[in-house]
């Protein structure tokens, strides 16, 4: 210490430092010492001065010219806080976007899955419908084989469609049973899986009867003598059906003449031919009735007697229709003759 600055000077010796004192700044005057009574209260204790313009109190400190206002620290937000808020908002936005995209993806996947399921169900339904249609067509074309059990006997019967339907029905099965086993349809009771087959027009496929199924038959067979008579009646029944087709053709031709489809100069000759054909048809029906009357059926031949009765009623109905056609032919002939006579006059 002695080497650096020499001997230490006492604090009270300030008179010698006059030349070293900092000079006063321009515009400032040295403070003059005033007694406390003249100074007044301190600045903090003085009443605030009112502003003439606004009427509000304003502080007097720093109001004098040249007075320095105290420096106020500005409230600044840290940059780190702003960056953290921005980062958080970005993270929230990204998470929301990710959630939305996931939800959209899930909804799209669910929609695609539902569409796939619907398309698969539709495809299955179409395939099942096609398979059912193919099965029905095959059954209609080739028929089906059914095992019919009667008492202690088993019969494998081949059933085909004979009623003009697209597939075999119960009536077709009953007819085959009557022809092969010998039990009349009126005495038959066909049972499949505990249910009686009563509706004759119901398709076999609708009842679940397929190729190889087993059907039980309950009913009494006819005697051999009655079977002979039944065959005769069936032959006569087929003949009646053929004659009935001829009668239907006659009726159509007569309707065409009545509606004027044939020239007038040919109508008279056509009516004469129709009249002869109708009379021949009537003779054919009468011959069938005579053949039916020649059949001798005992009282115990119940099925044969019932079948003969039904056949007689059918022939009588066709004979009545023949009479109607013959009357219409006569009326049309008379009308045509009267017209020609009027034209001749």
UniProtKB/Swiss-Prot annotation:
BAG domain ranges (all copies): 246-326
A Pfam entry, by short name: BAG
Low complexity: compositionally biased ranges: 95-114
Entry keyword Transferase: no
Mod. after translation: Ubiquitinated; mediated by SIAH1 or SIAH2 and leading to its subsequent proteasomal degradation.
Region span, Interaction with PPP1R15A: 216-345
Annotated stretches, region: Interaction with HSPA8: 172-219
The Ubiquitin-like domain, residue ranges: 144-224
GO molecular function: adenyl-nucleotide exchange factor activity; protein-folding chaperone binding; ubiquitin protein ligase binding
Extent of Basic and acidic residues compositional bias: 81-91, 115-137
Function: Co-chaperone for HSP70 and HSC70 chaperone proteins. Acts as a nucleotide-exchange factor (NEF) promoting the release of ADP from the HSP70 and HSC70 proteins thereby triggering client/substrate protein release. Nucleotide release is mediated via its binding to the nucleotide-binding domain (NBD) of HSPA8/HSC70 where as the substrate release is mediated via its binding to the substrate-binding domain (SBD) of HSPA8/HSC70. Inhibits the pro-apoptotic function of PPP1R15A, and has anti-apoptotic activity. Markedly increases the anti-cell death function of BCL2 induced by various stimuli.
Name used for this protein in its record: BAG family molecular chaperone regulator 1
């Amino acid at each position: 210490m002695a080497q650096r600055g020499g001997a230490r000077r006492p604090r009270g010796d300030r008179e010698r430092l006059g030349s070293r004192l900092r000079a006063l700044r321009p515009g400032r005057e040295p403070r003059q010492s005033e007694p406390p009574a003249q100074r007044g209260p301190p600045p903090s204790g003085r009443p605030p001065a009112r502003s003439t313009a606004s009427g509000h109190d304003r502080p007097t400190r720093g109001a004098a010219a040249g007075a320095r206002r105290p420096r106020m620290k500005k409230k600044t937000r840290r940059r780190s806080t702003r960056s953290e808020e921005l980062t958080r908002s970005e993270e929230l936005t990204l998470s929301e976007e990710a959630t939305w995209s996931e939800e959209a993806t899930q909804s799209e996947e669910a929609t695609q899955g539902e569409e796939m399921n619907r398309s698969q169900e539709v495809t299955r339904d179409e395939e099942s419908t096609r398979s059912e249609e193919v099965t029905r067509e095959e059954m209609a074309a080739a028929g089906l084989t059914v095992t019919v059990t009667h008492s202690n006997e088993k019969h494998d019967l081949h059933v085909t469609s004979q009623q003009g339907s697209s597939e075999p029905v119960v009536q077709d099965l009953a007819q085959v049973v009557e022809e092969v086993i010998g039990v009349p349809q009126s005495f038959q009771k066909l049972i499949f899986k505990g249910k009686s087959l009563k509706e004759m027009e119901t398709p076999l496929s609708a009842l679940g009867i397929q190729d190889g199924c087993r059907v039980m038959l309950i009913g009494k067979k006819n005697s051999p003598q009655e079977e002979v008579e039944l065959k005769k009646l069936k032959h006569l029944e087929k003949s009646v059906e053929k004659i009935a087709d001829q009668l239907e053709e006659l009726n159509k031709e007569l309707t065409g003449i009545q509606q004027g489809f044939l020239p007038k100069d040919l109508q008279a000759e056509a009516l004469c031919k129709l009249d002869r054909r109708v009379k021949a048809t009537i003779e054919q029906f009468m011959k069938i009735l005579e053949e039916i009357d020649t059949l001798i059926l005992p009282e115990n031949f119940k099925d044969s007697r019932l079948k003969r009765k039904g056949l007689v009623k059918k022939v009588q109905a066709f004979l009545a229709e023949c009479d109607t056609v013959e009357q219409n032919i006569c009326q049309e002939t008379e009308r045509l003759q009267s017209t020609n006579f009027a034209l001749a006059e």
